[in-house]
Design a protein with these regions (language model features):
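Glycine-rich adenosine-cofactor-binding loop
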Residues: 1-8
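Residues at the starts of beta-strands that form the adenosine-phosphate
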Residues: 12-13
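C-terminal helix-to-coil terminal segments
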Residues: 102-148
Length: 148
């Protein structure tokens, strides 16, 4: 939701796919909820903020449905991206750029992908917002207070 709100503040038309009902309390009243195929074919930038599923959200099949020159950002789980397919798409120009905060293997990242000139990497800090840290602190206090 926060990614969508920030995109809207920058004037972006934000599309979202949810596999459940629209999130309760979603502040993005102008966010458009669409199918995955609609999102893939219409988006200039695809931001992954989803838990891991049965298969990667970004693979050769989904990349083929995307616009040429798409930008892909993954701040969720490394398993959501087929790294070999993304590297092929970057090399062919199908994907213009990628921002990656997570890897399939954090201990042994795909160095060909990490060193690609069109890839920007961060060390798994996508969830390190002030808001997230406050929530973590509150949860820890709750755990300590209710211990035993």
């Amino acid at each position: 939701q926060l990614v969508g709100a920030k995109g809207q503040a920058l004037g972006m038309n934000v599309l979202s796919v949810v596999h459940r009902n629209k999130p309760e309390g979603c502040e993005c009243e102008t966010m458009h909820f669409v199918t995955m195929d609609e999102l893939l074919s219409q988006s200039d930038i695809v931001v992954l903020c989803a838990p891991s599923g049965d298969k990667p959200l970004v693979d050769a099949e989904s990349l083929a449905k995307m616009k040429d020159g798409v930008v892909i950002i993954n701040v969720s789980r490394g398993a959501n991206v087929n790294e070999a397919a993304l590297l092929d798409a970057l090399n062919s120009g199908k994907v213009k750029a990628a921002g990656l905060d997570v890897w399939l293997s954090e201990k042994d990242p795909n160095w060909a992908l990490a060193s690609h000139p069109a890839v920007s990497c961060t060390p798994h800090i996508g969830a390190g917002t002030k808001e997230a840290q406050k929530r973590i602190g509150a949860e820890l206090v709750d755990i300590v207070e209710n211990f035993g």
